[in-house]
Design a protein with these regions (language model features):
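Second-shell loop/turn segments in exported
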Residues: 50-57, 122-130
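Mid-length scaffold segments of soluble, non-membrane domains
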Residues: 104, 112-119, 126-129
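Bacterial N-terminal signal peptides that target proteins for export
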Residues: 1-9
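N-terminal low-complexity, Pro/Thr/Ser-rich intrinsically disordered segments
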Residues: 26-58, 64, 201
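Short, conserved catalytic or interaction motifs in soluble domains
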Residues: 22
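A cross-family detector of function-defining hotspots
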Residues: 39, 53, 61-109, 131-201
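C-terminal motif of bacterial Sec signal peptides marking the signal peptidase cleavage site
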Residues: 18-19
């Protein structure tokens, strides 16, 4: 092989190696991390998400974390979960609603949140806009026919009786209606416990 042919061949090989080296990509950068919303971001949130949370308080949240995020409740009483197990009921008043309160039911055996009820507070609402004072029509238009309905007969001071209803949905939302058919309370609960929360239809 002649010297010039050998030089040409070496130049071609070097050129090919250089081309390969320049097209070789370095390691891919890691994908950006998607973080859960920080507790501070949810602190002033007033969204009721069925089966998940009410504002900054989540179902299954440890009691200690709930206090860190939401503060100390004004009262606590012994209670029972729908299945009969011991629980503690904690009450948080709402400064903007004199009769309003947030009631958090905590399992006694593991100190985690079982359900969260918003009573008579207009500022808490579902993504669909259902809130205290909303009509039964809006509830049904937003969530459809309830999977379960509970009824309670109440007697007024004048002796007249009226029926209050509670609509329960598999997504983990219970809606208590007053005697006029308007929303009185919203409760986020584990959807699988629907039949324990409301009497089956």
């Amino acid at each position: 092989m002649s010297h010039s042919l050998r030089t040409l061949w070496v130049a071609i090989v070097l050129l090919a190696l250089t081309a390969c080296a320049s097209t070789k990509k370095g390691p891919e950068p890691p994908p950006p991390k998607i973080e859960a919303p920080a507790a501070e971001n949810l602190l002033h949130d007033k969204t009721v998400i069925p089966g998940v949370r009410v504002g900054p308080v989540f179902l299954d949240m440890p009691l200690r974390k709930m206090i860190e995020v939401f503060g100390e409740p004004v009262s606590g009483t012994n209670s029972r979960m729908p299945g009969g197990r011991p629980a503690l009921l904690y009450r948080y008043p709402d400064p903007g609603a004199a009769d309003g309160a947030i009631l958090v039911l905590v399992r006694e055996h593991d100190q985690t949140v079982y359900s969260i009820q918003v009573e008579r507070i207009e500022t808490f609402r579902t993504r669909e806009g259902v809130r205290f004072g909303s009509s039964e029509a809006l509830v049904r238009a937003s969530f459809g026919k309830p999977q379960s309905v509970g009824e309670t007969t109440v007697t007024g001071q004048d002796g007249a009786t009226a029926v209050m209803r509670m609509y329960c949905y598999l997504n983990g939302l219970a809606v208590r209606l007053d005697t006029n058919g308007n929303v009185e309370a919203l409760t986020a609960f584990p959807g699988g416990d629907l039949r324990k929360i409301c009497k089956a239809q």
